[in-house]
Amino acid sequence: MAAAGARHYTSKDGSQHDLVRGIWKLLRLHTPEGLSTASIGWLALFFYAIQQQLSFESLRYTFLGIFACYQITHGVFCMWNDICDRDFDAQVARTKKRPLPSGMVTYTEAMVAFIIGLALSLGVTYAMLGEDVTLTMGPIWGLSFIYPLCKRAIWAPQAVLGLTMAACVLPPWVALGNDATNAKLPASLFGAIFSWLVYLDLIYASQDRPDDEKAGVKSLAVFLGDKLKACLTVLGALQIAFFAVAAFEASASSFLWVFGIAVWAISVPWSILSLNPRDRNSGGRIFLVNAILGIYLAAVSGTDVWLSSR
């Protein structure tokens, strides 16, 4: 909600201008999505800690640094995505009430907020995680910048998003002082997150497919058509396999295998079977469940680290 006393007024086209509330929503601070992004970094951090037998207490500052860096980065580039997609969003039923197409925030206001947020993301990352991690974040920021533009150029922008989010497993690896040697664990986590994010975004995009076709948005969900569930099945099998390899490489305990990997494996067929592409609300519900599942797996792996430290 907008802060008390925030300035808002009705624009000429009848839309409500509310800068504070609009920026809040552009940053996605009204949803748990940012926490879901941070959970990818936490998940990787805990898997590395299990492998290296690090105590939970030794991870606290890195844990907080990952949260701050990923939360700000997620919000800033969600804003950038909405800036780039403002014309498309106005044509899609689910997104036409977002701050920019609805007139809640102007283009200039959003651009100023984006530039400030980008500088803040860089500063916080450098201050809390150091130079090496800041350099490792570079490809993530770069891919996040080009992702919205890919919707106009290629039929698989989800692959770019998958690469962006998969790269989030690398800064925690560097933060713990590791290098490119013996990189099987980060490589397997990279594969798992890539498969999961493409799978997850396909589920999310399925609810917008009719509007995307009309608006000319390039989307893998549109391209696949009736083959959507077949592709989801392949991606689901890949993420289970990659997570299993990661758990093996980390020498995970039975606790993580049972409450983490097994639960994840069960969730995949449930998600695919529950998805109804003809029901616009179906994709959103399953997307939310899977976003929470990512936080859950991070919590399970963190609990494993804590139990091992006792």
UniProtKB/Swiss-Prot annotation:
Localization, UniProt: Membrane
EC assignment: 2.5.1.-
Pfam family, one: UbiA
Cofactor: Mg(2+)
PANTHER family: 4-HYDROXYBENZOATE POLYPRENYLTRANSFERASE, MITOCHONDRIAL, PRENYLTRANSFERASES
Function: olyprenyl transferase; part of the gene cluster that mediates the biosynthesis of the meroterpenoids nectripenoids A and B, as well as cochliquninone D and isocochliquninone E. The pathway probably begins with the HR-PKS ntnH that catalyzes two chain-extension steps to form a reduced triketide, which then primes the SAT domain in the NR-PKS ntnG to initiate three more cycles of extension to give a linear hexaketide corresponding to the polyketide part of nectripenoids.
Transmembrane stretches, start-end: 30-50, 63-83, 110-130, 154-174, 185-205, 230-250, 255-275, 286-306
Membrane topology qualifier: Multi-pass membrane protein
Top-level taxon of the source organism: Eukaryota
Any single GO BP term: terpenoid biosynthetic process
Name listed for the protein in its UniProt record: Polyprenyl transferase ntnF
Protein's UniProt keywords contain ATP-binding: no
Species name: Nectria sp
Pathway(s) served: Secondary metabolite biosynthesis; terpenoid biosynthesis
Family: Belongs to the UbiA prenyltransferase family.
InterPro entries hit by this protein: Prenyltransferase, UbiA_prenyltransferase, UbiA_prenylTrfase_CS, UbiA_sf
Any single Gene Ontology cellular-component annotation: plasma membrane
GO molecular-function term, one example from the UniProt record: transferase activity, transferring alkyl or aryl (other than methyl) groups
Keywords, sorted A to Z: Membrane, Transferase, Transmembrane, Transmembrane helix
Main location: membrane
